[in-house]
Each structure stands twice: as C-alpha cells, then as structure tokens.
C-alpha cells in the first residue's frame, strides 16, 4: 500500500523536481516527471473518495480486500493502477471540478504520455513551461 500522504508528498516532490529540471533545460526529464506529479495527486484523491484508509492498493490482494470490505465501484485494480490520466480523473471524483475550472490546463496536460521516458527531444522550453504551469494549477486544485 502507498499511504495517501505519501502520494501527496510524491506529487509535490515530482513537481518541484520537474521545475528544477526545466530551469536547467532538462526538458525531457522535466516533462516526464510532471505527468507523474498529476498521476500521484489523482491517486491520492482516489484514496480519499473510496475511503482507502490504508493507502493506495499496489497488488491484487490489497485491492480485493478493499473491494470486498467497501463494495467499491472499481471493478479491477487496473482501473486505477495505470497512467491513464482521464480514467484516473474520473475515479478521483474531480472530473467536474477540473473540467469546469481548468479545462484548458487539463487539455494541455493530456499531451503527457508515460512513454516519454523512452523518447528524446520531446519538448522545448516553451512546451515544458506550458505543461508545467498547467500541472501546477491542476495539482493545487486537485489537492485542495
């Protein structure tokens, strides 16, 4: 299990690391991390909305225990243990808020792809700044 508090700390730390890398013109690494900062924030909200008191489930048995005890609406662990930001947004309970208040920023962050880990020259300073600024606003909204 990953504690909800740990997910929040990781989200904030990855955002800080992304900014440091961006300021050092390490745009590929910065862009890669910024998406994970959003992912961690959304997963922390999933813990809250589904009352995952022991944390975010990492393995099938942990998830099955939650499902059996809470009767939650999530059918399988892969529904929430993934990098699909749209799917995570839905399960986080934040979809309406995010799309109402920060739709443009959400559309920008959806450019992110975990496969960026394997790609060179995915972005420049302008793209990095745009995605980073969007992520920062989104994380502030999601975690409030």
Residue ranges of each PLM-predicted region?
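Terminal alpha-helical segments
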Residues: 1-144
């Amino acid at each position: 299990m990953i504690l909800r508090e740990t997910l929040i700390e990781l989200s904030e730390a990855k955002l800080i690391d992304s900014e440091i890398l961006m300021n050092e013109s390490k745009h590929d690494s910065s862009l890669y991390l910024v998406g994970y900062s959003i992912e961690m924030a959304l997963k922390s909200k999933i813990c809250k909305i589904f009352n995952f008191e022991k944390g975010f489930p990492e393995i099938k048995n942990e998830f099955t225990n939650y499902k059996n005890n809470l009767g939650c609406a999530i059918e399988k662990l892969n529904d929430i243990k993934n990098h699909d930001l749209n799917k995570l947004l839905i399960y986080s309970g934040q979809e309406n808020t995010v799309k109402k208040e920060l739709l443009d920023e959400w559309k920008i962050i959806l450019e992110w792809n975990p496969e960026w880990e394997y790609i060179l020259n995915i972005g420049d300073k302008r793209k990095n700044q745009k995605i980073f600024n969007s992520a920062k606003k989104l994380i502030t909204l999601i975690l409030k």
